[in-house]
Amino acid sequence: MKRKRILIIGPRGSGKSTLAKYINANPGPVRRVQDTIYAKATIDVPSAYLENTWMYRHLIALAQDAWCVLMLFDARAKESLYSPGFAKAFRIPVIGVITHYREECADPDRVYKQCLAAGIGEETVFFDGRDATMLCACLNELKERKGI
């Protein structure tokens, strides 16, 4: 049986690879690549899959190898790349992760509303690129609830 991983999706520059590095406990530098990366505990998907609506079917197919989806939202971005209700396309739990929220130009309240519009309920956490404690606690709680 295949080991289920965490699917990480988000716009360009939102911190997908950095987050994957923390979850996988990888001490190496973050590398920029154009391919889907299957790591020990994550599936890191390039932003091109999200930027092109005709690639959505590939995101949904990749979710078959995952036990949950992390949808990243950049607090600096003015617009969301996610379609309304996009999270509902997945049959596995979806967690919204708001990144870059401590920067001057960030607007976490606006981005939280984008999370709600994308179909993510209460499952929203913040990640600043340095401390993944809150996110790891959320993932562990979700694992316990799902019996994974």
Cite the ranges covered by each PLM segment.
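Signal for well-folded cores of large energy- and translation-related assemblies
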Residues: N24, G28, I60, Q64, ...
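Switch II of P-loop NTPase G domains
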Residues: I43-K88, C105
